[in-house]
Amino acid sequence: MRVAIIEFVTLDGVSQGPGSATEDTSDGFTRGGWLVPSIDEQFVRRASDWLDLADGLLLGRRTYEAFARDWPQIAEPDPFTERMNTLPKYVVTNTLAEGSWNPTTVLRGDPVETVAALKSQPGRELQVHGSARLGAALLSAGLVDTLRLVVAPAVIGSGRRLFTHPSESVGLRLRSHAATATGLLLLEYETTGVAPLADYAGVTELVDPDRAA
C-alpha cells in the first residue's frame, strides 16, 4: 500500500484544531475552527475524491480518540461519514489498550517499523489524517508517498505547527494544485527522496534573451 498524508494547515503552518474551537484545546490553544469559514463545494468534492482512494486510516492516538468521539455521532448524511466510520482504522500507540471505533487495529511498538510492515501489504492507500507528529515521523523515515495539503487563507499566530522538527529533509514534486473561490489551496505532492540543495548562481541561463531585450 501507499501512504498518503492529508493535512489542513494555515498560511503560517498551524495544523491544530481546524474544525472547531473545542476540537483540540491542548496547550491552551483557543483559536480552533480556522478552516470552517472557507469550506466550500470544491473543497468537499476534492476531499471526498481523496477519501475514495483509502483502504484504511492511519492515526496517532490523540487524533484517533477525537475522531472516535465525534464521527460516530454525526447523523446527517454527507460524503464522508459512512466511509470514515466503516474504513479500517490503524492507531499507532503504545498507550491505548484497544480501540472503541470499529474496525480498529492497535499498532504497538516502533511506529516506523509497524507502519512499514503494514505498508508492505497489498492495497491502495493508507491515509494519515491529522496526526501531525505521526505524519512527520513517517515522512522523515521515507514511508510517505503522497502529501496532500489544504492551506487555509488565515494566519493564526499560535498552535502546533505541521512538521515542526523533521529529522530528515524531503524533496517534493507538485502533482496538482487548485484554488477554491473561498481561497483554499488544494495541493498534492509526491515525495522524491532527499530535498535537493544548490548554490544560487544567478538566473541568466533561465531568461530568454529575446524576451529580456
Regions found by a protein language model. Give the residues of each.
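Portal/gating segments that form or line small-molecule/metal binding sites
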Residues: 1-143, 153-213
